[in-house]
């Protein structure tokens, strides 16, 4: 009996040991399965991470571009860093320079007609590098897309109103950003317009708020001028007109909706051609009939006529001598500044001050316009105007 007990006991021990070994093997197998499962999951995770990295790279690639909406309402995708710029037929050279604080970097080409204007203003001295850029086109109707492509620009700036031109430019595959002039983006107020140009340049270069202080400084000048004009009685505010061009003895005046019309509105002058839409051809007799009290002459690039030409009656085909504006020597030429002053430009607040001061001299008798201009140029364009340059601005 004892022998059976010993045998049973031995068998029980063996069974227990076998069960233990089996458990160990099962644990080992389970561990191996878990490790394999974890390894598989790790591999799956790693494999799933791969496309995530690609997506990240895509985002980085997207970060290398910037999508903006221009004044034509088009969404434009631009490279993050812009190093080569072509400016087509839109007069933003001076605003571009002001945006860059007295310099004009990255411009590799622009319209030759714009260069002709720049050559007649102080802009050529502030940013002489502009004179080295290529001429991509010359006349308003010229367009040589092949020459533009050769310059390898990152972006082309163009007149947002000119849809036909955009169609040609955009086919180059080069991003095109439209800047509003007349007929786009609401009313053509020159002061508001140059501010809109500056803001769009902030979008283009990804520098939101860069020109905020500059624009605020301009607003301060504008407010001062507005307050002075407000002191002038309505009955003492004159009638006037802006002679925009004079082509082959045919006068073209600034009618309703033009930059010139908005300038006259700002200074409280009644435009004698306010019922004429846009820049309109009129005959000399119509001007005689309207007989404005003040005659403003447009400036470089548009009208090659000076105050002395008019006062001394030297203009072929136009006898100014019987006009009240001439008799009273109320004729003013906008030669001043870094651009044609009656179109949008960063001198806008100064233009406003000048127009108001010549129109209402009594209200501005203590206003130091020349000092204001000098300070403005030094602060915002990093340029010290000489007395000779100031005198030349007013030699009109």
PLM region descriptions:
Residues 115-119, 162-167, 179-199, 232-259:
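Extracytoplasmic ligand-binding site segments that recognize negatively charged/polar headgroups
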Residues 88-89, 93-147, 155:
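A short, structured surface patch at a secondary-structure boundary
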